[in-house]
Amino acid sequence: MILACHNIKKAFGEEVIVSGGSFHIEDHEKAALVGPNGAGKTTLLKMIVGEIQADGGNVVLTRGKTMGYLAQHQDMNNDRTIYQEVRTAKADILDMERQIREIEQEMKHLSGERLEERMNTYQRLTAAFERENGYACESEITGVLKGLGFTEEEFAKPVATLSGGQKTRVSLGKLLLTKPDILLLDEPTNHLDLNSISWLETYLLNYPGALLIVSHVRYFLNRVVTKVVEIELGKLTTFMGNYTDYAKKKEMLREARMKEYLNQQQEIKHQEAVIEKLRSFNREKSIKRAESREKMLDKMTPVEKPMELHTDMHLTLEPSCVSGNDVLIVEHLSKAFPPQILFENISFEIKRGEHVAIIGDNGTGKTTILKILNQVLKADSGSFRLGSNVKIGYYDQEHHVLHMEKTIFQEISDDYPNLNNTQIRKVLAAFLFTGDDVFKLIGDLSGGERGRVSLAKLMLSEANFLILDEPTNHLDITSKEILEHALNNYTGTVLYVSHDRYFINQTATRIMDLVNHTFVNYIGNYDYYLEKKEELTAAYSNTSRLENNSSSATTDLASDSKLSWQEQKEAQAKERKRANEFKKTEERIGVLEDRSAEIDILMAQEEVYTNSVKCQELAKERAEIDAELETLYEKWEELAE
């Protein structure tokens, strides 16, 4: 065991964060700390590292072990470059190397006992340097920086010029390079693109120390952790397994506890009814038996009713009208912020009902495309047009569509003046804003709260074409699942940018990967994208070996993606047709199976089986149904392949 938290207690006034919870982390164990927004995850991490004092209990770190903590906000030395700042994580090793080089120079001018003394020091230092893998220090720094999405050209960038997200990546790099015995990470995937998240997953999987991580990224948690510690309603509960295992076990546990509670309540009601009946007999024996049952009830240990969180927002997305089949047509679009080219000459179409995800590395122009489509930015060249009857609903990750000086209530009432006060409060309550909360200024809200206001406006817009920029940012896992459910039931069209692979996998019917200034299309969800990308990578690798010219192979791959655009559109249309046919077949099978079951019930009724004419009619109908079902089952199997 490397870390143990015993009977931890913490409250801020009347708000209880933890009420006597305990958990532990074993050596080399990878654990997640999960819970709704505001449950106290970050507060608990700060208690563990000593930034916040617990009201009770204690935190024990095994003697001699080191702990590293990545907070959501970090301080930086603005006078250094990115590389210099990250290099400070290896200060001890670099100082050791400096001493070794100095002794090497000294020994050139020494002899006798003094030389022997310095030689012993030199051997001791070089042995320690090798143990710490000092000779690979610089390459390790470079590898971590590249893994976190920095190019070598960016290594010399001054820290003072970096964005908040870039500074967070620098801090994460420093922490990883210090290699403490246990890492505490608070939302480490924030500001990372898909490639960097994948790199971090692999790094942490191979990390020799222990890990306690706060994250809302389910793919990430599923791949990295083997234990989940839940903080909810002031209680700490430990579940073995990854996030999916935790979610299943939690639901099973909740159902079991509710069943136990309901069974006991039913038993209590039954006993009380029996007691009342016995007393109504008004006989000595009956009264004694009633008293005996009352004593039994008094001794019964009450099962506590499972507490349920009432913190789930309610989101329903319904378009007010149906758009034309062609929702968006983009032709030869280009954009650059010199000297950087984001994308050039891109063309694509989006049809009604599609859910399209745009993915790609940070800085490739994904959000820029959405801003161009919403006329926030202008393209350098090219054009786009919307189809007939298209109404856009826009979700901006930076929430520029919100007004910082307005209250939440004003934000809704000004945009939707037809809603009365009661209707506005009802909408806001669905997004967890109640009482005086509705009079908070937008500028004073957290990122998650602003996200909920933006989602409320999106719901009220009744748009039939949703354009969403990182819609899951700042949402807890439950809220993400609610958004996924709403989008999957949405009958309109969706175009979004996201780094949340689980979200993409659940909601996308098509993925456009922005790579090498153009789009590569994948008609499917994220799992399909990974599968096809591996095939493309293998094909690219084979081409490279055959031609021994990687640049030529890259050009060929990009050219192929452009040449196959028409084929991809045809394949997409074919897939939509197959999906529609598959759905119709399933629905018809369901109708026939229901009717078949009805016939079975009817033929078992006396008024039917004694009526030969009715029996023959039903038998004939049943035979026709069976024949049609046989055909439909075969068709379903073909369409499912």
Regions found by a protein language model. Give the residues of each.
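Short intracellular "coupling" helices and adjacent cytoplasmic loop segments at the cytosolic face
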Residues: 110, 276-288, 305, 432
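Short amphipathic coiled-coil heptad-repeat segments
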Residues: 142-148, 273-277, 295-302, 598
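ABC ATP-binding cassette signature C-motif
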Residues: 1-262, 311-569, 574-641
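Intracellular alpha-helical coupling/juxtamembrane segments of multi-pass membrane proteins
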Residues: 249-274, 286, 290-300, 304-306
